[in-house]
Every structure is written in structure tokens, then in C-alpha cells.
């Protein structure tokens, strides 16, 4: 049995006449089978060229017809074009067509309309059945191991949204990633369509809808803070280029971890300006640490504490603002319904504890990073993603690292953690909050390091100089409830070397460094 493949431009009148004759033959001959292929006029020539190169044929016009032997297999046999097929039909089957040129043109336009309508239906169907493409960078990191079960539980994107996870890392991590793939498949999650690995740089972020950027390992030894800052640039430049080139146009990028989170976020925005508005930094890890410390002090559950605000550098100089923080379901002489809450600062009578011990514990956690392990990082990322897609709890304040546009007097052009709420698939900065003003000295201290990090990383400044204030008391009386966590010590900010990171490709040398800065 032979099958004739008839391919042509959707608006080609000769294809229309060929199709009519082929339909007649298939209807009246038991062993005559046809397969039709139409292409839009603008892509026809490229498609035809690819087919001819693949089969080593020579054909330049529409339509093109070839035979495939279904019972034997093997290479298809080129029959030719419009004239050759009509000649074949007349000689073998004594069938001809008397279709007029005018009718051929009418049918050709109908074919084009039908082709466009079919394409639109297929695209609409794909949006319903295509899974959400989730990419995780540095997938050999511990946080990835803890993040996958949360993503596949359906809690983040919903039980009606299927996901495909791609684990991206270097070639040296491939065996570890293969083991991770097997474990992920063993979860038998109803929302997991597939899980795969990618170690080829040029294939990274193909059609990605969500990209999770985890802490990366360094591939060379660094001895100074300046070198460490500059070492972030090549990888962020590479990721930015690949995101612009390969990812879906509405991709969402979320940066998590404990080292240079704000810097990596602003660098990604610089090198992927097209989607800069969809790049955020996770601050819920620091927020969770603060809630846990407060909960231990108040002898309650961390989940009962709400509205802790993280200002500034997520992995460095930041302030934990407790002025809006409230505790629910607190066991005391005063009880109320579930929605009843009390200000945390009214329940902590020892103000010195807030100013000293609370700050010291936070500083120790930030400096060592030992408590910010895989579980906390994964949960913080997953929760932020959940809020991004489905909205944050009504009335609740969420801390998020985003590009400053001058809100709260923060300098423009730096990534800064500030209070927001999530709604309708995006975030809204809570600029209408009352009594959250921060003094100029404190704001300068927080922003100075972030600005210097960016300048040193980009080579616009040689040395990093920590901010020094001439004021003996940096925290005025009205801001005693801001807990300041100093920047982490440099040696603890350097990620441990595990595998060699993907190197920049040659095409990066020609990459133009577009920025989001005006």
C-alpha cells in the first residue's frame, strides 16, 4: 500500500486542485491513501527547503507530492509537483480535473482561512494541556532537593496546573541530577507531567515559564570581597542572555538563597531587561527567622506572628521592622476570636531584648547562614511563588526584594526588600502604610552597601568601603523597634565550591549589555 503526501502553501490554487483530485481517488480506490500538509505562505519556502535537504530532493514550487511505502518503510519517493501528480492520476487511474482557474483561487483562499483557524484552535488547546515549564538553576544545591516535593504537591501552582520541571546544572553534576530525577518520578505526583535535566548552556530556559535561581557554587578561588562581587557578573550575564533568548515572554524569575541575593537580582535585571519587571528576590527566609525568634520569646507558634517587615539587603545590611507586627491566638489574660490580634511590641516588655538580644540572634543567623538551609530556602521560595500566582493572604504584609522606583525614599536602581502584597498575579508596594518612616541615616546605611555592591561588581568602583556614620547613635528613639542586622562577614558569603559552573559561550562576547537603567 502506498500513501501519497501532498504538501503546499495554504493559499496555493494548484494545491487546491491537487487536493481535490487526491480526495476523489482516496474515496474511490480502497488502497489509495493521502496525507495533507499545509503551511502558511510566509513559512512555506523555509519548510520546503528543510524537507528537500532532509530527503536530498530538488523541488522549488507548491505543491510537492511524494510517496511513502507503508508496508516496506524506507525513504519516501518524490513524485513531483502539480503537473506530475495530475499526469500520474490520468495515466494510472484515468482521472482528470476540469476545475476552472477562478474556482481554484476561491478554494485556495478558503484553504488559507481553514489553515489559520486550525492553527488558532491548536494553540488554544496547547494552552490548556501544555504544562507549566519550571526551571531550577544550580539544581545540585540542597534547596532544590527540598523544593521539588513542594512544587509537585500542587500547593504552589494549584492541583489543576500540570508542571514540567527541568533541573539545570553543569555536566559534573549530571549523575546527581539523574538520581534526583528518579526520586522525583517516584513521587507519582498527579501534577507532575515530566522531570528532566539540562547540562547544555545553549539549551537553558527553553520556553521557561518559571525560573528559580538558587545559590551557585563558585568555580574559582576568591580572596577579597571585591573579587567575590565581581565573580557574580559572568554567570548573571549568561543567565540574563539565555533568559532573553530562550524563555517564554512572560517568564517569572525568582532569586533565592543566602549570598548576594539583591546583587544577583539587580544583575539579572540588567542583563535581561525585557523581563526585568518579572524578576524578584525572596525575603521570606529572613522574615521566617525573625518570626521564629519572636515566637520563642512569646512562647507561641511562629505562624501566629504576622506582618514582620524586612527592609534593605536580604543577605546583608537589613532592618527587621516590628512596628506593624502582630500576634494572633496569643495565650494571655485577654482572649478574642481567631481574627483578634495584638501588637507584638506591647507584649515584649523588655525593650532591651528587642534592641540587643533579638538583633544579636538575627545577626548571628545572617553572618553564619547555618540556619538558612535547604528546608527554609525551599519553603520561602515556594511560598513566594504561591503568593505570586494566587495572591497573598488578605491584609497581610509580605516582604519582597524588588527594583526600587523611589518608594519610601529609597534610591532608584537598586533591589531593596520592602513591604508588598500580592494580587492579580503581581505585587503592589504598600506605600500607604503609616508610621513606617525610616531616618535618613539608617536608610543611607542600608542603601550605601547595595549601591557599592553594584558598582564594584560592574567595575565602576575598585574598592568596597562599608558605610561609616559620624553619629554615635544611629537609631533614633522613634526607630528603636527596627532591629538592625549587619552585613554578613565576607568569608561566610562565599559559596562552597562543588562543581564547575557552566562557562560563557563564545556568543556572549558579542552580547550587547542592555540595561534597565535610564
Swiss-Prot record:
Family listed: Belongs to the LDH/MDH superfamily. MDH type 2 family.
Group of enzyme by EC: oxidoreductase
Keywords linked to the UniProt accession: NAD, Oxidoreductase, Tricarboxylic acid cycle
MF GO annotations: L-malate dehydrogenase (NAD+) activity
Highest taxon, organism lineage: Eukaryota
Gene Ontology biological-process annotations: malate metabolic process; NADH metabolic process; oxaloacetate metabolic process; tricarboxylic acid cycle
Protein name per its UniProtKB record: Putative malate dehydrogenase 1B
Pfam families: Ldh_1_C
Gene (name only): MDH1B
Enzyme Commission number, as recorded: 1.1.1.-
